[in-house]
Amino acid sequence: MKKKKKVKEGKTKSLVHFLKKQSHQYVDEKFQQAHEEVFEEISCLDCANCCKTLGPRIKSSDIKRISKFIGISIKKFQHDFLKVDEDNDWVLKQLPCPFLEENNDCSIYEVRPSACRAYPHTDTWQQKKQLSLHLKNIPFCPAVEKIFEKINK
């Protein structure tokens, strides 16, 4: 099993090395196509690993929007749900996300943080700038892994 994982990691790193040498347009088109194909096959609700293991950075605009939605003051929201990390950013105090329901639905989906809205960042432009982030996300997000597999075909 470890050998297969090493081979897969090697192929992924080789692909990243190849993609770094390609034009931005080429890389963006490959990611866009693979992203669309993968998300026709995968539902994030089947996994929700990002909500269980990754803490998003929460912007001040997110804090205002979410606290208003759940009907508490900004100060109470910050006190009850957030902490300041080593980069001086607001992040969740606890994981899994306190807004993740048992069926993997998000109780604040309509107003979820912008970092959650954008995750896994595979359908934006300038994908060459995101490659190292994608490598870090592969262990957490099966969709990112499948996107790399599709691009590598």
Regions of interest found by a model, annotated:
Residues 1-153:
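Short loop/turn segments that flank or connect secondary-structure elements
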